[in-house]
């Protein structure tokens, strides 16, 4: 080979890991009539160019002892032809034959990059991250990362000794995306990105924002995921997905079991580690299905560095947490759930992210994913960065992650966390600590547009059909579940935080004082049909000193459990879908602790087994009785029979479906049995007592009406017929026409 020039300035910039355009000097280049190959291989002893068949084309001369080599390929190639060669590299302890990463042309389609810059989440999903694939018949990994403010980016990992000089990336300048194909590596490789800010300063090594797999914390590297294996995963849930696509979930029975998967099951014999997805599939899935729940909802499982955040401070929104095993394990978990008749909902956090140095904050030396102004970009309550969802690329990145959960893992629902914090610019901020919108108001117009885009995308052709969206929205923002075409946000369901706060406040009162707080239980019906609601008894209500559900109740242990049973009977009969956090289904005494399992040992006690049995029966009756769910979002599905008996703390109402089927719920929230309580009923004849939360099987006194009551033509409560009931203490009855 002939000598080949290698500019000194280029050498110095490459060795200093600050060259802005490595493809301008590395790889094959025409110099006069010759094709010159230049490489940067720190630590290499000798480099030769070899042909595809293995023959040596020639030696690359070492032009700098730090690892720069250059040489010219033999003549005879047409000017427009890409040279075909490999590099044979002698390292101190091995020889490596590999294609030159800088011999490949541009990787990403310009149209896809333009669509990403315009905010298309499908383009973000297609372009960004690490993808094992073949380029020109050569296996390797394509890396791509959005970092428009960086002056230089390289990919580092085990494959190059974490040397930031080895694999600098190409900038696709109009779009701010850096790309590189690294030959002969594949799925399972650990990697990060080494970036320099615009001023040349080196930044902390950054994990890939679009990584689909990560190391288990506290380690922080990204891992090249085997996306082909996920795409080839042997799903057997076609029938489930077809049924989901045609199901009108708003008028179906929905009862959600909320689970913190890191603590639901731990393996004590192995250092109290969290269970894997496969272990959870064997234990959690049959348990939740056996309890009659329709869905399990998982607190955020996208990789998060701090376990104490319960997943709500994620840095890798595309990657199932490695705490539970590889990504394919989560796919198997969902497959098991669908086979058992359970839907899977995942919590998703597009509002904010933590400040860990390997994460998204100041990713390229600028406020890239967050707002630059701390009045917009820093959350004072959580000490986290606020996503700048008004930036098109950030919105595309986030919504792409939601699409990934729907496509790759077949999840059935996505619950959006902290929506209120996104909707209001002054959320948890004092005067002077927030920036008004362009009209001078407090509404966050960018977040509104983002949430509409999210829902339109998840309900459109880009997503699998039938994926439901849920909003944790704690204010009275109008139209959360209204269609975006009608100026709503477009969610399928909204958590009814007002109902939860009011009813729990009522139940905390000593029964003797409840007459003074009667309206707390009736007020929810004033707005119950303004949105499609979920009634949430979530993790947020059993942490930070709030106490467990059972501990919130007044009285001795028996009365506390009786109160809770009566409350559950009221809740399951009330309009709205149901959600219950783990441990609540058997009335555990301790509040939620992320590093401890639920108090499963309480199930050795008959009283707690009784509450568990009640929740199971409530779920099964709720699913079997269309009157309890078919018109959850319509006034025609509900009517008060007794809403004003504050002196006795008695409530009664009727639920109906559109075929005229009925079920009456009667609640006595005092410890005083009510005998001969005359209740107006909407039909004559025999009414079966289909549920009594005071039943002996549930841990109650077994007071009641012997399984049935008779409605005679005696007017009461505005009805033509009525029956004399015995109302057990602290209990709810359900009656159905026999």
Curated annotation (Swiss-Prot):
Its EC number is 2.4.1.18. It comes from the Bacteria. It is an enzyme of class 2 (transferase). Pathway: Glycan biosynthesis; glycogen biosynthesis. GO terms for biological process: glycogen biosynthetic process. InterPro entries: A-amylase/branching_C, Branching_enzy, GlgB, GlgB_N, GlgB_N_E_set_prok, Glyco_hydro_13_cat_dom, Glyco_hydro_13_N, Glyco_hydro_b. One of its GO terms (molecular function) is cation binding. The keyword Transferase applies. GO terms for cellular component: cytosol. CDD domains: AmyAc_Glg_BE, E_set_GBE_prok_N. Keywords: Carbohydrate metabolism, Glycogen biosynthesis, Glycogen metabolism, Glycosyltransferase, Transferase. It catalyses: Transfers a segment of a (1->4)-alpha-D-glucan chain to a primary hydroxy group in a similar glucan chain. Coiled coil: none annotated. The keyword Transferase applies. The active site is at 417 (nucleophile), 472 (proton donor). PANTHER family: 1,4-ALPHA-GLUCAN-BRANCHING ENZYME. Belongs to the glycosyl hydrolase 13 family. GlgB subfamily. Monomer. HAMAP family: GlgB (MF_00685). Catalyzes the formation of the alpha-1,6-glucosidic linkages in glycogen by scission of a 1,4-alpha-linked oligosaccharide from growing alpha-1,4-glucan chains and the subsequent attachment of the oligosaccharide to the alpha-1,6 position. This is 1,4-alpha-glucan branching enzyme GlgB. The lineage of its organism: Bacteria, Pseudomonadati, Pseudomonadota, Betaproteobacteria, Burkholderiales. The gene is glgB.
